[in-house]
Amino acid sequence: MNNDLLKRMRAYRGYKQYEIAEIIGLSRQTYNYKENGRLPLTSEEIVKISRELSLTLKDVNDIFFNGQLPN
């Protein structure tokens, strides 16, 4: 996962960590651990974050799969 890209995209879209945490049903601390790579995100969390941030498929691939998904 590209943690820095996720942080930049979240900030660019105007969200604070606690807001994304609330949206996906996590505590702010747990979301912080996940955003910083200390804990993995579940596929359901990836979907919720992607929808909330209006990420493109390319964004999702670059952020969550390090560009490793086939085109």
Q: Model-flagged regions — what are they?
A:
Residues 1-4, 69-71:
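Short, Lys/Arg-enriched, disordered terminal segments
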Residues 2, 13, 39-42:
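Flexible coil/turn residues that form the inter-helical turn or adjacent wing/linker of helix-turn-helix
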Residues 4-23:
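Short basic helix-loop element that most often maps to the first helix and adjoining turn
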Residues 9-12, 51, 58-71:
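Short, charged recognition helix plus adjacent turn
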Residues 38-51:
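Short, basic-rich loop-to-helix N-cap that marks the start of a DNA-contacting helix
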